[in-house]
């Protein structure tokens, strides 16, 4: 059929799951989840795959082994794209993102060397400002409180140096277009606009081989 958005009932499903995160609720609504939540995500990923690579949908079950919150089910559905990209749908709307959420020690060292490079670092700083001017969010996930060891605390790009990851994202609240095929246009537009950040990271840092 092709992607046609998520229904208002899919939004309500996650709203109800937030208040009744139990096996009984999940079992009673699993068929709805598969048909009206997961299947639209799979259709969206299929339509994005030609430009952004295959996607993988995360399992709906939370890992609760070391968590105080023992709620068994995720109150959202999300997927990752092979060429960089993340799509999430939940009761609060739709989110698209890309970048490196958490870098390894080796990645961080390559990243920091690129940030202090006069050409590569300045280009990245200008890019992040352009993305923010376009209404996108850019941040480092977890941030160091001070400069990383061995790097000057007064560096012109200290904000970027303090990042332990670097991601760009946009979140849209629930609106009528979310229930239509137009939701794909929002995701596609974001991924194209933010693509230079993913390309910079892939070229200057490189993905985690693991």
Model-derived regions: residue spans:
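Charge-dense, helix-prone N-terminal extensions
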Residues: 1-210
């Amino acid at each position: 059929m092709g992607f046609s958005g998520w229904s208002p009932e899919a939004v309500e499903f996650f709203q109800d799951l937030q208040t009744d995160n139990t096996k009984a609720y999940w079992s009673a609504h699993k068929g709805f989840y598969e048909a009206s939540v997961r299947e639209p995500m799979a259709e969206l990923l299929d339509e994005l795959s030609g430009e952004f690579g295959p996607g993988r949908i995360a399992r709906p079950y939370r890992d609760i082994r070391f968590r105080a919150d023992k709620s068994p089910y995720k109150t959202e559905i999300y997927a990752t794209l092979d060429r960089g990209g993340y799509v999430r749908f939940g009761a609060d709307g739709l989110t698209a993102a890309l970048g490196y959420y958490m870098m390894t020690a080796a990645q961080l060292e390559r990243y920091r060397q690129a940030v202090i490079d006069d050409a590569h670092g300045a280009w990245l700083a200008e890019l992040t400002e352009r993305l923010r001017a376009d209404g996108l969010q850019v941040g480092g996930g977890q941030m160091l409180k001070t400069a990383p060891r061995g790097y000057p605390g007064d560096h012109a790009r200290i904000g970027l140096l303090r990042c332990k990851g670097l991601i760009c994202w946009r979140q849209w609240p629930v609106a009528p277009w979310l229930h239509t095929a137009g939701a794909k246009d929002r995701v596609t537009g974001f991924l194209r606009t933010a693509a230079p950040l993913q390309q910079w990271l892939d070229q200057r840092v490189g993905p985690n081989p693991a």
